[in-house]
């Protein structure tokens, strides 16, 4: 076991090679945008520095960044002996993914005269892409090596950028909060990967695939950070003014309604009426996922609350009934239950977005219609029903790319070259980390065993 999981050559090799390649590509392809470059900014905007996009976008970026590194990281620390890996590997793949995403998204969206322009908006978008990778990470948590995760990130970020380009640039979809591009894509990509990586003997580590009191408390820290900052996440790249304001408000009320639904149904599905911490940690966030696409639209506060309530309901029911079915019948071993937090609520959000877009009119939006649906300003033949149709097509495209991409990635990750943990050592930090106290515990265990053997001989 020790030899097969030894990463002394594998991990340094892939980390160093990837970072060297990234540095070279950044040196050749990347430059500051007009709001970041000293010469361009001071030439074009010599009056008021407060008009720089930094002051409009950075507060949202800061919140999103905390969600990626603190929220997602702590949320996955629920496993009793996998806290180092949950936080550490989250840190590793996020740091890589945001760099690779800058290049991939820039290639499709931000090329200017052969250069990729970066600034605070591109940083937010890179974090969004990273979020999709971390969602997929949740499906394979505890069963993969960091080398596998980096390879998965390379492929997923690339396909994320392709899917995002098709949805936003070709189909003209609205998806500022990422119900489709982030949550649905990340969830079904990860579910397909974990299906291909199915471990028939994972029961050998079943006792470690659970939480203890303090690990659930740590995970709840992640939940609270995500819950508080989700309005910033959904509104981060929306248009300034009323669309951004409306998105934050819709997310705010959706999350609140979702939380009450989560507590209610968590108690309802338990024969003794007790709450399940897994439901509270995860399903309470589903409202933020489900309102991501329609958040900037005139969904109304009560509409947002209905969406949040539905999201919390299907998420709890998914954890209670669907996850066990998927594992036993479909052989999908979804460690974090991403299908319930991101998959189904993401699809719900896409459907809500399509319906809300199809019902849009100037009677409701006034001149604000052109700010939410940008193509309406340039096309006199624009139709809300057609827009709703393209939103629905975008969901189908996302599911197709995610499932096919996850299938290919899963088979690549099955190659026996990554130092993956054996079935008996899944969900265990000590496979890849120096864990304080492990050597002492092992020494004490040997002493006790020796003492017992001596006592048996003497008797």
Swiss-Prot record:
What is the annotated localization of this protein?
Basolateral cell membrane; Cytoplasmic vesicle membrane
Which residue ranges run through the membrane? 11-31, 59-79, 88-108, 122-142, 150-170, 177-197, 217-237, 249-269, 275-295, 297-317, 341-361, 393-413
Residues bearing carbohydrate: 45
Q: Keywords for this entry?
A: Ammonia transport, Cell membrane, Cytoplasmic vesicle, Glycoprotein, Membrane, Transmembrane, Transmembrane helix, Transport
Which segments sit on the Cytoplasmic face? 1-10, 80-87, 143-149, 198-216, 270-274, 318-340, 414-459
> InterPro entries of this UniProt entry?
Ammonium/urea_transptr, NH4_transpt_AmtB-like_dom, RhesusRHD
A GO MF label: ammonium channel activity
Segments of this protein annotated with the region Disordered: 440-459
Q: How does it sit in the membrane?
A: Multi-pass membrane protein
Question: What does the entry list under GO cellular component?
Answer: basolateral plasma membrane; cytoplasmic vesicle membrane; plasma membrane
One Gene Ontology term from the biological process aspect of the record: ammonium homeostasis
Q: In its keyword annotation, does this UniProt entry include Nucleus?
A: no
| Extracellular topological domain | 32-58, 109-121, 171-176, 238-248, 296, 362-392
Task: Give the UniProt family note.
Answer: Belongs to the ammonium transporter (TC 2.A.49) family. Rh subfamily.
The function of this protein is: Functions as an ammonia transporter. May play a role in the elimination of ammonia in the gill.
Q: Which PANTHER family would you find in this protein's record? A: AMMONIUM TRANSPORTER (PTHR11730), AMMONIUM TRANSPORTER RH TYPE B (PTHR11730:SF42)
Mind telling me what this protein is named? Ammonium transporter Rh type B
- The scientific name of the source species is Danio rerio (Zebrafish)
Lineage of the organism:
Eukaryota, Metazoa, Chordata, Craniata, Vertebrata
Q: Which gene encodes it?
A: rhbg
């Amino acid at each position: 076991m020790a030899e097969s999981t030894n990463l002394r050559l594998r991990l340094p090799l892939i980390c160093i090679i990837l970072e060297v390649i990234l540095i070279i590509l950044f040196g050749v392809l990347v430059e500051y945008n007009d709001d970041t470059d000293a010469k361009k900014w001071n030439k074009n905007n010599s009056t008021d520095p407060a008009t720089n996009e930094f002051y409009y976008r950075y507060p949202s970026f800061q919140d999103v960044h905390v969600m990626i590194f603190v929220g997602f990281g702590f949320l996955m620390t629920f496993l009793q002996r996998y806290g180092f890996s949950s936080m550490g590997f989250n840190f590793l793949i996020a740091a890589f993914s945001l760099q690779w995403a800058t290049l991939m998204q820039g290639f499709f969206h931000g090329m200017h005269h052969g250069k990729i322009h970066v600034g605070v908006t591109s940083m937010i978008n890179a974090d969004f892409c990273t979020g999709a990778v971390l969602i997929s990470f949740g499906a394979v948590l505890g069963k993969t090596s960091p080398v596998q995760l980096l390879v998965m990130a390379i492929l997923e970020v690339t396909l994320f950028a392709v899917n995002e380009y098709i949805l936003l640039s070709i189909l003209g979809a609205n998806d500022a909060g990422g119900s489709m591009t982030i949550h649905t894509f990340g969830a079904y990509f990860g579910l397909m990967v974990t299906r291909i990586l199915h471990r028939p003997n994972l029961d050998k580590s079943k006792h470690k695939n659970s939480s203890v009191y303090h690990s659930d408390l740590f995970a709840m820290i992640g939940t609270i950070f995500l819950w508080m900052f989700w309005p910033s996440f959904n509104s981060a790249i929306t248009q300034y003014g009323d669309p951004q304001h409306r998105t934050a408000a819709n997310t705010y009320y959706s999350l609140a309604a979702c939380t009450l639904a989560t507590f209610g149904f968590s108690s309802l599905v338990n024969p003794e009426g007790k709450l399940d911490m897994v439901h509270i940690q995860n399903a309470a966030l589903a409202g933020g996922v489900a309102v991501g696409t329609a958040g900037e639209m005139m969904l109304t506060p009560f509409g947002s609350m209905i969406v949040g309530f539905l999201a919390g309901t299907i998420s709890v029911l998914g954890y209670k009934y669907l996850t066990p079915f998927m594992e036993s019948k479909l052989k999908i071993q979804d460690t974090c239950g991403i299908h319930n937090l991101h998959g189904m609520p993401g699809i719900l959000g896409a459907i809500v977005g399509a319906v809300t877009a199809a019902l849009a009119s100037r009677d409701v939006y006034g001149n604000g219609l052109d700010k939410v649906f940008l193509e309406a300003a340039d096309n006199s033949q624009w139709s809300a029903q057609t827009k709703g149709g393209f939103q629905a097509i975008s969901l189908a495209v996302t599911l197709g790319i995610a499932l096919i991409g996850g299938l290919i990635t899963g088979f690549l990750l099955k190659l026996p070259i990554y130092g993956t943990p054996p079935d008996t050592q899944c969900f265990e930090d000590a496979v890849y980390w120096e864990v304080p106290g492990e050597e002492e515990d092992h020494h004490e265990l040997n002493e006790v065993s020796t003492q017992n053997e001596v006592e048996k001989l003497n008797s």
